[in-house]
Amino acid sequence: MEDTKPRSLDFVERYHVAQHRAGSLPYITIIGLMIHPDFNQMVFNIRNNVDRLMREHPVLVAAIDDTDSRRLRWIINNNEPPFVTDQYLLHPVIDANRHPVSGPADVASIEDGEAQEFNLNQGPLWRVAVYKPKLRCPVTHYIALTVHHVVADSIGALNLFEDILRPHSVNHDPGLERSLPPKAKKTMRIQPSITGIIKKGVQSILNHKSSWKVTRGHGVTIKWPPPSLLKAPPRKPDVSHFSLDLRKDQHRVVERLEALGDHTGSIHSLLHTAAVIALTAATANDIFHTIDTETPKSLRSEDLTHPRIGGNYTGLIERSIPRWKLGRYTMASFTKKFNDYIHSPEGESEARSNMGELLLVPDRIIPNFWKSSLEKTATSGDPYRHSLSISNIGRFDPKDIVGLEKVWFCHASMP
């Protein structure tokens, strides 16, 4: 592998490490149902792709140094990674043991447990596993990719998933110089508000060591958590299943979700989205006149190019659409119109202005406001929040991936 220059973690990457250290490991799992006549050939192809990706993208073999300090740096493992890839040994990234499972929920449960074993100080911070469905034909398998958020966010994970499954004969663009992904601030065009700039400046001054002698820590709200306050990750995965019977529970959606929140301690925006969609679908009256959408938009600039594998920082585009307008379009034409706006200069400007500033990582516990927020949303006149086919996991283009039947997306809950 080519050598590359080390660099410190940016604010977003540090936030993911802080989540990990706080006992809420942020990861993404993508599961694909594959039908392939030759299991050995399928695994051989996956292995070749994984090894190539590890050579091309240093972040896939990197680790993180000195996680007990705020000055985190990537460990460059390009030439001598602490894990060995050998055709006669167990692969450090691929688990091809074909564990028998009943379905994708079982896969998600196992992957959750494996993700808890990710070692920030050593790596690798991603894995690929092959599972065998119990009730399907012998040529059917689940392929699971699990990636730590510090390596790639959801959009980067989808690109990685595609590259792992593509036939080895497909030509690949060598891309840019083989280096770690650049810092977020070097790849984004954002338009922070004046208030945000002032707030960040004051915050930085208060947190500077030279200011502590004068302020004695007054106003300091941000500090890297010391090892004594760390929370150990769960040793056993805890994957919960939750369902709503709209015929019985259409007036208890918020109550049921509150019960779920009391049990799990957090709720993911995907569950929020599913709940309000179900609430709208279960409502027979005409009180919902407008559909509100929020769609993540890449903040990468075309002139500030970056590797495909390495994540993608996003800002939100929010739109309100009168329901009567939907009758003028097919789903395809309406989605295209919405997509055109997202990729227009106006849409990009909206996402950049909503982004504001990337702030430092706080060490205090953030209050759990999701209950009151969801209660307010569910009782509003237009609680529908959905981004149609433009989702926060990006567009998945399975061309050249023969035998891929279905894809599931799993996400660790946010603290």
Annotate each PLM feature:
Residues 131, 146-148, 296-298, 391-393:
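Structured loops at beta-to-helix junctions and adjacent beta-edge loops in soluble globular domains
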Residues 1-189, 193, 266-287, 398-415:
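Non-catalytic N-terminal regions of enzymes
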Residues 172-225:
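Secretion/export-associated helical scaffolds and adjacent low-complexity Pro/Gly/Ser/Thr-rich regions
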Residues 21-36, 71-99, 125, 234-243, ...:
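Acyl/amide activation-and-transfer machinery of modular secondary-metabolite enzymes
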Residues 313-396:
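Helical lid/core segments from catalytic subdomains that handle acyl or acyl-like groups
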Residues 203-265:
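Flexible, P/S/T/G-rich "lid" or insertion loops adjacent to the active sites of thioester-utilizing
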Residues 268-269, 286-289, 347-354:
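Acidic/polar loop patches that form or flank catalytic/metal-binding clefts of enzymes
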Residues 233-235, 354-360, 391-392, 397-413:
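C-terminal accessory segments of proteins
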